[in-house]
Amino acid sequence: MEKNVCKMTDDSIFLIDIEKILKTKAGKKYKYIPRFVVSYLKHIVHQDELNVFLKDSKNKVGVDFLEACMEFLDAKVEIKGLENLPENGKCTFVSNHPLGGQDGVALGYILGKHYNGNVRYLVNDLLMNLHGLAPLCIPINKTGSQSRDFPKMVEAGFASDNHIIMFPAGLCSRRQGGEIKDLEWKKTFVTKSIETHRDVVPLHFEGRNSDFFYNLANICKALGIKFNIAMLYLADEMLKNRHKTFTLTIGKPIPWQTFDKTKTPAQWAQFVKDVVYKL
């Protein structure tokens, strides 16, 4: 992958600014937000620490940026089934999403390095603000101004010559019935892999967040709170998981022809999810 020689100044890079976000979202009501709330939000998103990293890595993009993320998190990954990575053709890589941080970074780094940067994530468009990550991202947003373009953006991603990395659950794993597993996998990766003749490679990433995170998510669900409050704590969870070694298991590719009419696309998505959790 080519190195980006463009030098960026601190003023031109995205930095986390909780006060600016709250002022934008709350408008005139911002003045009624207690200062301790603002301070707490800065604390749980680790604003100062992450901004130091973003400044230090401002001239790194793509796989180089992901490598810097791995070093910052002191994350190590033991890989099983490396021989299952296809050398020919375009593939869709699908994985469980236990962490919301290290798993995404590690998959992009490992696959990006193996395929010389020819990988793309389908991600929430908010991540496009990260200059270093943006070249590897296909922004998707099912709500707001981009909702009309959502199918078009997904289409463009799968029609490209890059391998696609997806977390079909959309959200990171939750505790369900005492077991930490992904929520329902969406069928998009099945339908688009069929259309573009991409084999599907199942991946399983071993890891978990704290009990606090899972309990909070379940409490919010029980109370009917639609806003994903647990998401605010993902940066905190990511840093709690520093200095750890994770295990990535790569399964054998599933030929796209497998996804025939004997099951619906949603059923095939569940089938692949089951394959992942058996790895």
Swiss-Prot record:
Coiled coil: none annotated. Its EC number is 2.3.1.-. Pathway: Lipid metabolism. Pfam families: Acyltransf_2. The keyword Lipid biosynthesis applies. It is an enzyme of class 2 (transferase). It comes from the Bacteria. InterPro entries: ACT14924-like_Acyltransf_dom. One of its GO terms (molecular function) is acyltransferase activity. Keywords: Acyltransferase, Lipid biosynthesis, Lipid metabolism, Transferase. It catalyses: a lyso-glycine lipid + a fatty acyl-[ACP] = a glycine lipid + holo-[ACP]; N-[(3R)-3-hydroxyhexadecanoyl]-glycine + hexadecanoyl-[ACP] = N-[(3R)-3-(hexadecanoyloxy)hexadecanoyl]-glycine + holo-[ACP]. One of its GO terms (biological process) is lipid metabolic process. Belongs to the O-acyltransferase GlsA family. Is involved in the production of glycine lipids (GL), which are phosphorus-free membrane lipids. Catalyzes the second step of GL biosynthesis, i.e. the O-acylation of the hydroxyl group of lyso-glycine lipids, resulting in the production of the mature diacylated glycine lipids. This is Lyso-glycine lipid O-acyltransferase. It comes from Phocaeicola vulgatus (strain ATCC 8482 / DSM 1447 / JCM 5826 / CCUG 4940 / NBRC 14291 / NCTC 11154) (Bacteroides vulgatus). The gene is glsA.
